[in-house]
């Protein structure tokens, strides 16, 4: 049963990673054709399709494009599904609920009862679900602030993206621009690693002490699962970072030859 759980995790990981790796370049090219920086203001992004230059035959317009690490953001989504599968699979090996615990846990929507003890800590909060919806909201907020002319000047994330895109369009040294893109991707990777590590530690610490003492196999299974998820997450972040670097270098070459 434990091996089936791990096989399911690995298959889920490769499924979503393959899908987003194949889909993100097309989405990224489409976004580049819709959004670009304005000539008169470095902090304003025009979202009107009539004001935007097109990318034709692999050539980028000389005014520059707005660079967004869409591959990185969408590439992080598989690991939240991965954590959801891990959380639900780990809970399947727990003991059944008593009627009193089932009645007490039915009043909460985002809590999953794990043990049949009588103390108030017998149910664990599924923080992975809450963090997943928070991540989706964060994505919506970032893209809204980035592509809105009213909020761009007051948002640090959007300003950093605009500076990065400005360096793409105005820099004459390809190596300097490539290093700046790599540094930005590395910073985004570090932020995602830290937030995901906090999620894992929070979910793991939510297991009640009574369950850890009464059923050590549950603690061992969940601990191994969380660590395997972390290892896959870190390895895939490294892969996505190199993928972004080569993709960004391709964009730089297109801008240079346009």
From Swiss-Prot:
<keyword id="KW-1133">Transmembrane helix</keyword>
<feature type="signal peptide">
    <location>
        <begin position="1"/>
        <end position="23"/>
    </location>
</feature>
<keyword id="KW-0325">Glycoprotein</keyword>
<keyword id="KW-0732">Signal</keyword>
<feature type="glycosylation site" description="N-linked (GlcNAc...) asparagine">
    <location>
        <position position="118"/>
    </location>
</feature>
<feature type="transmembrane region" description="Helical">
    <location>
        <begin position="65"/>
        <end position="85"/>
    </location>
</feature>
<protein>
    <recommendedName>
        <fullName>putative uncharacterized membrane protein YNL228W</fullName>
    </recommendedName>
</protein>
<feature type="topological domain" description="Extracellular">
    <location>
        <begin position="86"/>
        <end position="123"/>
    </location>
</feature>
<feature type="transmembrane region" description="Helical">
    <location>
        <begin position="124"/>
        <end position="144"/>
    </location>
</feature>
<dbReference type="GO" id="GO:0016020">
    <property type="term" value="C:membrane"/>
</dbReference>
<feature type="topological domain" description="Extracellular">
    <location>
        <begin position="252"/>
        <end position="258"/>
    </location>
</feature>
<feature type="transmembrane region" description="Helical">
    <location>
        <begin position="231"/>
        <end position="251"/>
    </location>
</feature>
<feature type="topological domain" description="Cytoplasmic">
    <location>
        <begin position="24"/>
        <end position="64"/>
    </location>
</feature>
<keyword id="KW-0812">Transmembrane</keyword>
<keyword id="KW-0472">Membrane</keyword>
<feature type="topological domain" description="Cytoplasmic">
    <location>
        <begin position="145"/>
        <end position="230"/>
    </location>
</feature>
């Amino acid at each position: 049963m434990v091996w089936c759980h791990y096989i399911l995790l690995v298959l889920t990981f490769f499924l979503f990673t393959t899908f987003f790796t194949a889909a993100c370049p097309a989405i990224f090219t489409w976004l580049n054709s819709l959004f670009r920086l304005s000539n008169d203001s470095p902090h304003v992004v025009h979202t009107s399709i009539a004001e935007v230059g097109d990318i034709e035959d692999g050539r980028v317009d000389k005014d520059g494009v707005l660079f967004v690490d869409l591959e990185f953001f969408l590439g992080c989504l598989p690991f939240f599904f991965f954590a959801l599968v891990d959380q639900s699979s780990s809970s399947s090996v727990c003991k059944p609920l008593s009627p009193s615990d089932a009645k007490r846990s039915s009043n909460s929507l985002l809590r999953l009862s794990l043990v049949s003890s009588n103390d108030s800590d017998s149910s664990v909060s599924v923080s992975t679900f809450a963090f997943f919806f928070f991540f989706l909201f964060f994505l919506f907020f970032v893209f809204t602030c980035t592509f809105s002319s009213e909020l761009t000047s007051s948002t640090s994330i959007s300003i950093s993206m605009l500076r990065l895109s400005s360096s793409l369009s105005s820099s004459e040294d390809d190596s300097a621009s490539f290093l700046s893109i790599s540094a930005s991707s590395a910073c985004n990777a570090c932020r995602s690693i830290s937030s995901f590590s906090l999620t894992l530690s929070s979910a793991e610490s939510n297991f009640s002490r009574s369950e850890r003492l009464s059923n050590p196999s549950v603690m061992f299974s969940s601990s191994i699962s969380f660590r395997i998820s972390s290892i896959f997450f870190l390895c895939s972040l490294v892969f996505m970072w190199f993928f972004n670097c080569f993709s960004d270098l391709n964009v730089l070459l297109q801008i240079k030859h346009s």
